Amino acid sequence: KIFYYIPPKVWIWGEKRVEKLRLADYIMVIFPWEVDFYKKHNISAIYFGNPFTDFYKKVERTGNKILLLPGSRRQEIKAMLPVFEEIINDLKEDKFILKLNSTQDLKYTENFKKYDNVEIIIDKKLKDIVSDCKLSVATSGTITLELALLGLPSIVVYKTTFINYLIGKYILKIGYISLPNLVLNDEIFPELIQKDCEAKNIEKHMKKILENLPEIEEKIENMRKKVEGKAVVESYADFLVKEGK
């Protein structure tokens, strides 16, 4: 038997690719809308929930810092750090945490040494940082789902080259780019892309988030319910053992 756990995101990149997945006996997916997508193509999909919900639980937040997440790719980091620096310079009364993925990324942060309202962190786990924060600004990626599951209101940002943006806009067939918004099919986190991704606009959305926290936190909770399962990783493993005999 052929089991395909977490298949390619054909619902993003084009439905033609779905034909190759018919070779599998079981398609095991981790997002609720994928079940309906495959059903439309007469393919049965197995869904027990998203495995991230086993590991990311809502964190009690007592701090007042703003978490900045520039991404992991060099291009993302170099695009976002100047924007983050402008925000740090504008909001001198706020305290910031700049979370990097690697010590190799420190070479891009020389300009940040002159600011006393920002702390650069590399090794600390995200869930241990979130408790110290009131919101985050995060480069689009799976980290946006982690932030939502941890309960931290966020702004999703992304900058790329104009050509890559045009190609992505042409290929992508979905309305949102961040996973929390896709799950709920609603805007939980504002998405500021390309020309919208500039400091003053981000600052405006920060203010708006803090003024509407109860509504945003309710949406975050509704999103969690959509992807939550009971012992998700164990459920997929049990299914593999049972059906793989």
Put a short name on every predicted segment.
Residues 228-245:
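C-terminal alpha-helical cap of glycosyltransferases
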